[in-house]
């Protein structure tokens, strides 16, 4: 399973040659569509249709996890406590990738710290 954070969404929604090539490679590997926890939208959108157009177009190709269960929230809280860093959204992204998933991000520092306490979660920089 592939989970995207806000940085990955911003980069992949650019429609650059590199972004298109990465999406095609992920599709070929069976990792598309990715999962995007709905709370990530708070970080990658501005709430303005015009400025959010590229991201909104891109998000139509993703699976949006629209709810955060109590179990997922508690797992994210545990990861955040163990890592001693990262935002609540970052912790939910990593918890959503458990077990055995990959998180794609533009800034791996906090996510890697959280993933160090998760069950077989890899963090890859875009």
Tell where the protein language model's regions lie, with residue ranges.
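Alpha-helix capping/helix-boundary segments
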Residues: 8-9, 40, 72, 92-93, ...
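Short, well-structured N-terminal submotif of metal-dependent ribonuclease cores
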Residues: 1-36, 45-63, 118, 124-126
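Acidic, metal-associated active-site segment
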Residues: 44, 87-102
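Short, flexible loop segments at the rims of nucleotide/cofactor-binding pockets, characterized by
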Residues: 11-14, 42-43, 80-84
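Short beta-strand scaffold positions
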Residues: 36, 67, 88, 105-106
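Phosphate- and divalent-cation-binding pockets in alpha/beta enzyme and binding domains
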Residues: 43-44, 75, 113-114
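Acidic catalytic patch
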Residues: 61-82, 108
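Acidic, PIN/NYN-like endoribonuclease modules and their adjacent C-terminal/linker elements
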Residues: 98-126
